Amino acid sequence: MVVVLRPWSLDDAAALFVASRSNPDLATQFPDVGLDDEEQARAHIRGALRFDERAKNWAIVEDGVAVGNVGLSAIEFLHATAWAHYWLAADARGRGLATRALTSVSTWAFDAGLFRLELGHRSNNPASCRVAATAGFRAEGVERQKLRYGSERFDVETHARLATDPVPDLPGFEVRTTS
C-alpha cells in the first residue's frame, strides 16, 4: 500500500463520485452539493476542494486512487490558526489512514508557521473522535446543538492541537503541495 497526500486533481472526479456514494454518512461532508455525476464532482474539486492561501485540501491517495480528504480551512497567519477536517470513503476506513493523514498535515502546517489547529466532530461520531485524539488533538469542549442535518441538531466536540503539543508517534505520509 502506497499512500500520498496531494492536492486534488480534476482527474480524481470519478474517485470522488464513488467515494461520495460509499456511505450515507458522507452526505454531511458534501452539504448543498450535488455529486450526481463526474462533472459535478469536478465542479466540487474546483470549488470546495481547492488548494490556495485560505484553504488546502489534500486527496488521500492510496495506490493511485483518491479515497478521502484531509484539509485545512480558515487558514490565517495573524493568529497562526486553521481548521482541520477529514473524511474517508467507506472501504478506506478502519486502517489508520485518516489518523496518519491528519498527523502528517498537522506537521506540515506547523512547519509552515501555524501554531493552533482546531477541528470538530459530531458527538455521536466516536470514530472521528478517535482519529482526532490519536493524531494529538486534545478535546476542549462541546458546542451544544451546533450542527443541523435535516431536522436534527447535533452537539459538536471541539479539539485542538498546538505546535508545542507532543508529536504522535505515527508513521507519516508524504505531503505534496502540487499534484
Locate each region found by the language model.
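Acyl-donor (CoA/ACP) binding surface of acyl/acetyltransferases
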Residues: 1-15, 19-24, 59-179
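Generic alpha-helical scaffold signal
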Residues: 10, 35-39, 54, 78
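Conserved GNAT-fold acetyl-CoA-binding loop/helix
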Residues: 25-46
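A short helix-loop-beta-strand connector motif used in the catalytic cores of GNAT acetyltransferases and
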Residues: 46-59
